[in-house]
Amino acid sequence: MAPWLQLCSVFFTVNACLNGSQLAVAAGGSGRARGADTCGWRGVGPASRNSGLYNITFKYDNCTTYLNPVGKHVIADAQNITISQYACHDQVAVTILWSPGALGIEFLKGFRVILEELKSEGRQCQQLILKDPKQLNSSFKRTGMESQPFLNMKFETDYFVKVVPFPSIKNESNYHPFFFRTRACDLLLQPDNLACKPFWKPRNLNISQHGSDMQVSFDHAPHNFGFRFFYLHYKLKHEGPFKRKTCKQEQTTETTSCLLQNVSPGDYIIELVDDTNTTRKVMHYALKPVHSPWAGPIRAVAITVPLVVISAFATLFTVMCRKKQQENIYSHLDEESSESSTYTAALPRERLRPRPKVFLCYSSKDGQNHMNVVQCFAYFLQDFCGCEVALDLWEDFSLCREGQREWVIQKIHESQFIIVVCSKGMKYFVDKKNYKHKGGGRGSGKGELFLVAVSAIAEKLRQAKQSSSAALSKFIAVYFDYSCEGDVPGILDLSTKYRLMDNLPQLCSHLHSRDHGLQEPGQHTRQGSRRNYFRSKSGRSLYVAICNMHQFIDEEPDWFEKQFVPFHPPPLRYREPVLEKFDSGLVLNDVMCKPGPESDFCLKVEAAVLGATGPADSQHESQHGGLDQDGEARPALDGSAALQPLLHTVKAGSPSDMPRDSGIYDSSVPSSELSLPLMEGLSTDQTETSSLTESVSSSSGLGEEEPPALPSKLLSSGSCKADLGCRSYTDELHAVAPL
């Protein structure tokens, strides 16, 4: 060989040795540099290298940013998926590389890289969001994509990875996974590395529950291993990162205990690791909910008892409130025991004392509520004040037998006291009648019996004034609190006036003033106080009736004006032909009775002249009776039934047009059946004296001048026969103004 050839070979050999050592150092250094560089995350980085195209830049995060993965287009699976494995901090780290598919690449906004252990539930996720360029095209289909490194992976463990493009119409489960297995420790690290040597694991790892605490006990390694403390990693099964608890190794015992306090119940993954990461053991433990001592019956009792106590207090409060309301309403019922005993002891003596006779006059033009008040007031006078009351609503038999006007005159003459219940209707019609009478005209309201009664009472009042002032005490005018003193007619100004129920004690004393010598001083005043009158059922019934009248007035303040406002009379109706009867001149009463049960009453009575009589005789008869015949022949404008003429004709009438009793009582209901509440409140002894069959009472105030209606049980033959010799009361009514 030529010398120059030998010289060249030696030169190349030396050069190769020198360059080889440098290349080896460079290769090792670059590997270590790569390991140091790839163990950390990059926020933004290029996704392709040496592709000949523009770089694609992604923004990386750990799937915390929520982007809707569902789209409207199909994006193909990732292509050419490869796994790059290397060691980071003595553990396995991998990087995923792939290329995008051509289908739907123009709609691609990013990727999600999901890494899971095959036989465990651990899951790691990375999200790559396309930053530059904003949109890809088919020229990028061979561009390589690269994920961030996945750290802290186990040696020789099976994993799978999914690269899911988004937004895609396909679901995550529709993309195929890529399976791989991590390499062994000695392939990724040096064989003499401690991490690759077999490591010691505790033989026993015990977990126990103490209330809401969890205690982990394990036997530690021998002292020659050099372990100073252990790390206890724990988390719920479906939570994210582990929580760590440091447990110091106990030197005096062979076991070490670590207490986890106030842990929530659930399924836990517990991992024991030593300080050099050479000892690791994993366990699963289910921590049960803690049953409080207040659970079960104790809790039920603890809940029920307060509810019962609260309900009891609420019930007691309600009862007290209602009792207070009742005390406010019936405050007059509260009487001292001594006063009650005095009142009870006084009752037998009062039964022996004569009961003053009282005649009650009232208006029938103030509605049914006012009539209820009057009826309750009559019962109250009889029950509580110890009076014998004459009320027409109670004695229809006497009215039918004697005649209404005759009955009124008789009761005015017999009664010791005459009480006129004044009201708006009475004031209006009495004043109107007097005005029409003075003016010579004939007004509405004629035929009402209370007008006749008031006129007779006024005449008696004038006579009493002329005789003696003591005789005036017989006449009393009362009005309730829904009326006023102005409702007292002017012709009754001489009478004693009382407002009820404010002046109830004075009224009771007035009614018993004639037997002051028999009673103890102040007895009736105490008995008739506002507090005492609620003690009886009749008093409470009167209270209710007054309240009903107040309510009616509040609902219709102008009820009286609506009912009695003057209006143009309607056209005269056709009147049925009159059948005249002529006979011997005697006056007979023909009573037409409505067939029905025993409670029915006589509906219509008219007088007939049975002989030819001249007009002068008729006029003479009417003047003596105090009647206005011409006014009687016309119907009243206020809607009340007209008086039937005493000496005229007989006309046939059907049951439908027969006049009723104008408010004294309803002919369809027996007067013995009272429609007001609590009327049974009369005491036994007073009920005996005020029974409907034996009482002298009947009202003067509400009836019309009709022949009296007899109960049908008294009319066995179907007709009523009146006395032929009807005596006249012209001597009693000689000064009464004609109606």
Curated annotation (Swiss-Prot):
Please give the tissue specificity annotation from the record for this chain: Expressed in umbilical vein endothelial cells and in several highly vascularized tissues such as kidney, colon, skeletal muscle, heart and small intestine. Highly expressed in ductal epithelial cells of salivary glands, seminal vesicles and the collecting tubules of the kidney. Isoform 1 is also highly expressed in both fetal and adult brain, pituitary, tonsils, spleen, adenoids, fetal kidney, liver, testes and ovary. Isoform 1 is also expressed at moderate levels in primary aortic endothelial cells and adrenal medulla, and at low levels in adrenal cortex.
Give the consequence of mutating residue 468 to L: In HH18; reduced activity
Transmembrane regions listed in the UniProt entry: 300-320
Write the signal peptide boundaries.
Answer: 1-16
Sequence ranges assigned to domain SEFIR in this UniProt record: 355-509
Q: State where the protein is found.
A: Golgi apparatus membrane; Cell membrane
The record, for PANTHER family, names: INTERLEUKIN-17 RECEPTOR (PTHR15583), INTERLEUKIN-17 RECEPTOR D (PTHR15583:SF14)
Topology, Cytoplasmic side:
321-739
Q: Which is a Pfam family this sequence falls into?
A: IL17R_D_N
What name does UniProt use for this protein?
Interleukin-17 receptor D
Which InterPro entries does UniProt cross-reference here?
IL-17_rcpt-like (IPR039465), IL17R_D_N (IPR031951), SEFIR_dom (IPR013568), Toll_tir_struct_dom_sf (IPR035897)
Q: Which residues lie on this side of the membrane: Extracellular?
A: 17-299
**Membrane topology reported for the UniProt record:** Single-pass type I membrane protein
**Gene Ontology CC terms, in alphabetical order:** Golgi apparatus; Golgi membrane; nucleoplasm; plasma membrane
Q: Which SUPFAM superfamilies match?
A: Toll/Interleukin receptor TIR domain
Q: What gene name is listed for this protein?
A: IL17RD
Annotated disease: Hypogonadotropic hypogonadism 18 with or without anosmia: A disorder characterized by absent or incomplete sexual maturation by the age of 18 years, in conjunction with low levels of circulating gonadotropins and testosterone and no other abnormalities of the hypothalamic-pituitary axis. In some cases, it is associated with non-reproductive phenotypes, such as anosmia, cleft palate, and sensorineural hearing loss. Anosmia or hyposmia is related to the absence or hypoplasia of the olfactory bulbs and tracts.
Outcome after substituting residue 735 to V: In HH18; the patient carries a second mutation in the HH-associated gene KISS1R; results in decreased expression at the cell surface
Cysteine pairings via disulfide bonds:
none
Record: glycosylation sites: 19, 55, 62, 80, 137, 171, 206, 277
